[in-house]
Amino acid sequence: SAYCQMAYLQQYPDRCAEVMKVVADKVKEMDVDVIVGPAMGGIVYAYELARQTGKRAIFTERVDNVMTLKRFAIHPGEKCLIAEDVVTTGISSLETKRVIEENGGICVGITCVVDRTKPEAPSPIPIVASALKLDLPNYAPEECPICKEGKLPLVHLGSRKMKQEAKQTL
C-alpha cells in the first residue's frame, strides 16, 4: 500500500518548516513549556515546532532499547507536548509520556506530521494537532502485499530494537 518515510521531508528545511507551521498554528495558544521529540523521528519536528512557538525543545532516546531522557532535564510541573513524525499506534508516544512523567513533567498531548491512527485503535494519548490525516492500512509483516511480492526487502526503519538487531547481525 504505502509507507510514510518522513526523513525525506527533513531533507528540505524550508518545506519542513512550512509543514510544521500547519501544526504550530494549531497549538500556538496551548499552555506548553517544552516540546519533546522521541528519537529519531521526532527530533527535527520537535525542534521546528519549538522554534515556531517559542518553546524549549528536547528529545528522548533509546538506551538499551528503553526510551530515556539522557541529555536534558524536565522540571517538575513542566507541561510537555510530544512532537512525532508519524503516529500509527502511539507506542513511542506512550514511552515518551512515561519518561516525561517519571521526570516530573505533565504530558499535554501529541502533535505529529502524519496521523495514521484508526478510529478502532485511537492513540492512547490525545493527538492535539497534525498536518495530515492519512487512512492507510496497517499490515503484519507476513500479511504485507509489498513484502509478499518480494520486490522490496522487509527492513525495520524505526529506532525501536535497532541496537538489538545490530547485535544479532554482528
Regions found by a protein language model. Name each.
Residues 1-170:
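PRPP-associated nucleotide enzymes
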